[in-house]
Amino acid sequence: MAKKPRVTKLNTDRRSRANERERQRVSEMNGMFDVLLNLLPPSHFKTRLSRVQILREATSYIIRLHNFLIESSNSDIDAITVFPHIFNGERKSNKDAIRRPMKLKQGGGVAAFISRHELPPLQLPNPVIPILKPTSVPVWPQTNVYIAYF
């Protein structure tokens, strides 16, 4: 007859620490998938994407960007028409771009800086200058939003 392993305080402490490490690992992975999802163009999906779907979408997006870079060197294809979400600030955000930095383990981290300020200036082929009528509504300056995950 096999002996039952005795449950000791040492074993329960080890198990508790291992469980806490696993919870932390899963939390970090979920945070990294959220960062990746927010870097993708707006999606037609109505429900939350699974991890596999996020990876497939990211792979497809990287391939499209790569193909665009190859094709654009030989033609006059405009990045603004192919990838308008990058230049127009139409990124999908679950929390309206209000996020807290992730707390990752020391030595590891994810950083994502998304700002229209860092993109090249928007230049249309034939700029149209509209004639504006004076209004009494004050116009506030636009501010850039920086999202950082560490």
UniProtKB/Swiss-Prot annotation:
Entry's Gene Ontology cellular component terms: nucleus
Region Disordered, residue ranges: 1-24
Main location: nucleus
Residues covered by region (Basic motif): 13-26
Any GO BP: positive regulation of distal tip cell migration
InterPro entries: bHLH_dom, E-box_TF_Regulators, HLH_DNA-bd_sf
Start-end of Basic and acidic residues biased regions: 11-24
Keywords: DNA-binding, Nucleus, Transcription, Transcription regulation
Stretches the record annotates as Helix-loop-helix motif: 27-65
Subcellular location: Nucleus
GO molecular function, a single term: protein dimerization activity
SMART domains the record matches: HLH
Disruption phenotype: RNAi-mediated knockdown reduces expression of alpha integrin ina-1 and ADAMTS protease gon-1, and causes defects in migration of the gonadal distal tip cells (DTCs).
Domain bHLH: 13-65
Function: Transcription factor which binds the E box motif 5'-GCAGGTG-3'. Involved in migration of the gonadal leader cells; distal tip cells (DTCs) in hermaphrodites, and linker cells in males. Positively regulates expression of alpha integrin ina-1 and ADAMTS protease gon-1.
Assembly description: Forms a heterodimer with helix-loop-helix protein hlh-2.
Protein name (database record): Helix-loop-helix protein hlh-12
Gene: hlh-12
